[in-house]
Amino acid sequence: MKHTERIVILDFGSQVTQLIARRLREMGIYCEILPFTARIADIQTPETKGIVLSGGPASVIEEGSPHPDEALYESGLPIFGICYGMQLIGQHYGSPVVPGSQGEYGPATISLHGDGSVWSGLGDKMDVWMSHGDHIEQVQEPLTQIAGSSAGIVAALAHRERRVYGVQFHPEVTHTPRGADLLRNFAVNVCGCTGGWSMESFVEQAVKEIRAAVGKSRVICATSGGLDSTVTAALVGKAIGRQLISLYVDTGLGRKGEREEIEELLAGHEHIQVRVVDASEEFFRELKGVTEPECKRKIIGRTFIEVFQREATALDGVEYLAQGTIYPDVIESVSVRGPSATIKSHHNVGGLPETLHLKLIEPLRELFKDETRKVGALLGLPETILYRHPFPGPGLAVRILGEVTRERCDTLRDADAIFIDELRRAGWYAKTRQAFVVLLPVKAVGVMGDQRTYENACVLRAVDTDDFMTADFTRLPFDLLSRVASRIANEVRGINRVTYDITSKPPATVEWE
């Protein structure tokens, strides 16, 4: 999509780089995250108004530490360095960076002075969040110090002649209360951004671009019933109407009543026509005897492609594939070490187009999840879709430890439905970001009436998170957990023991496989 202005964020590996982009976009300022290896030709484009250098876990004084294209310092573009990014600026302009004796971690209060363009409206004191070991020992010309911490550390600096700034703290996190104001000052006061980015303008532009690209061709979209694929279908459908075919493949690995719910929800939307294919027998046959998690994922991915390809080739005039790729999918598929080293191959990035020889449409690839949700609301999607908990691509197969069978899926479906039902009744479903049940390959002794039982154990999992990069377990009330455990043990055949997972991420992941 074409943009008249943007801020480029160079990623040096910080866990909160995406927060910088989200804060700016919340202000209506479009921005993109690029790996630090990006060349100046890709950064200094006509629409680029400024550059942000993110934080990162490395030390600028270590050999081989990540550095940007040196030409960006001579580009004339405004630059704003955060933590590691500030140290890069200091090092480049001759201000020595040294290891700290103990570093600064957590809340701090800094004193502001100097350059009014970035400090505008922030007063002379600011509460911030520090997280650094190294620091700039002494600011040298042509830089000048514009803020200091109570520990005597350089908290911010600026170039005397150029629009180059750095802060040692993290303005993007909520622990820096006025951080968003600081980022706005840089983007608006220094870079001259006008802030015209909105979801209304995005939808209008996306519809025009989809129509222009597709013409009279037909488009197929793999719809899972989740937020991303459903918004994709609704957006493409708004652009081209009945030229779009949404294909839902029933793998047999979905949640209880999922197929019926998706058919009902999507069939009622004016821009979406749904074609449902029941391929559950095929998936269970391929998964028979398989217990290793990665093998399950590969089998499910391969089988899905085979089914999708079979159905797509049976349709006349289909030339395009619409995918629900969103911006975090794109970011996660490119490492901060550059294109040669991927963090992971995301299921939404690549795969199907090469096999199907279809042209790819990814209308949401510039959007974060919260922006995708806003687009869905503008397109008239119901809250049951907009605020549904995330569900993994391989479905229940990665929530069943061990072999995946139809019987075990039915058992897990029933237990999961009870958990979600009780969360909704108690008003907790919307308070937690994700909740589900895991079926263990473990049996436990129990008592039912006068009979001894020897049946499966399951795990309840509920987490709180802003971005799923880190997560903490939800502190559900004990009486709620007790009701869930009692209902599962009494109503679900094959389960006699219920546990609750209280592990955070890290060290654990949200899903068990």
Predicted regions and their residues:
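RNA-binding accessory domains that recognize and position tRNA/RNA substrates
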Residues: 1-53, 57-63, 67-68, 73-75, ...
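Gly/Ala-rich beta-loop-alpha elbow adjacent to hydrolase catalytic centers
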Residues: 81, 85, 90
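Extended catalytic-interface subdomain
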Residues: 323-325
